[in-house]
Design a protein with these regions (language model features):
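Short acidic/polar active-site loop segments enriched in Thr and Asp
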Residues: 110
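Extreme N-terminal starter segment of soluble prokaryotic enzymes
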Residues: 11-15
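Divalent-metal-activated hydrolytic enzyme cores
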Residues: 24-27, 35, 54, 72-99, ...
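Active-site loop/lid in soluble adenylation, ligation, and acyl-transfer enzymes
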Residues: 17-30
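Short hydrophobic targeting helices and cationic amphipathic motifs
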Residues: 2-7
Length: 166
């Protein structure tokens, strides 16, 4: 045999919302700290992304919600993402979603772990578009785009339950 034998350890790489990894990138500049995610980071199994910041929004920033439809409607131009003050931030959300998709593709990610309830990252729930703190079933813009392209998307709760076997 002329070819050397190489053994490769294969690790699952995850795309994770940066705010879940302790980065203060949420709209209110807060972050979450999950030890399980920190452990994955120490093992270099994580690509971090904040779609809203990738789309050019500042931190802190005004809260935003999907108005007039679903995340899929936002992606097709039939709904908007607006701040509570009435600023249209739809394009920033779309740009951030596509930049996040590009990262996932470049790094051959299979699973994205995104922040539930976010207008970008929500997997199962988002806020209802009336700034009333009421949640409704739905996905955020980035989550919808990743799902559309065949990526597994889960919320932090689903992911942490999977890691701990609950």
């Amino acid at each position: 045999n002329r070819y050397p034998l190489f053994l490769f350890a294969t690790y699952m790489m995850y795309l994770i919302s940066a705010c879940l990894a302790g980065k203060p990138v949420r709209y209110d500049a807060k972050a979450y700290h999950y030890e399980a995610i920190q452990k994955l980071m120490r093992h270099q199994q994580v690509i971090l992304a904040c779609p809203e910041m990738l789309g050019g929004l500042a931190c802190p920033r005004q809260p935003a919600e999907i108005i007039g439809g679903t995340a899929q409607d936002v992606l097709t131009g039939h709904a908007k993402v607006m701040t509570q003050q009435g600023e249209d931030v739809t394009q920033a959300f779309i740009i951030g979603a596509y930049k996040t998709l590009e990262l996932a593709q470049q790094h051959q990610i299979k699973t994205a772990v995104l922040k539930e309830n976010s207008p970008s990252c929500g997997r199962n729930f988002i806020y209802d578009g009336r700034f009333s703190a009421t949640k409704r079933a739905g996905t955020g813009v980035t989550a919808a785009l990743l799902l559309q392209h065949g990526f597994e998307v889960c919320s932090e709760e689903e992911f942490l339950a999977r890691l701990t076997g609950l």
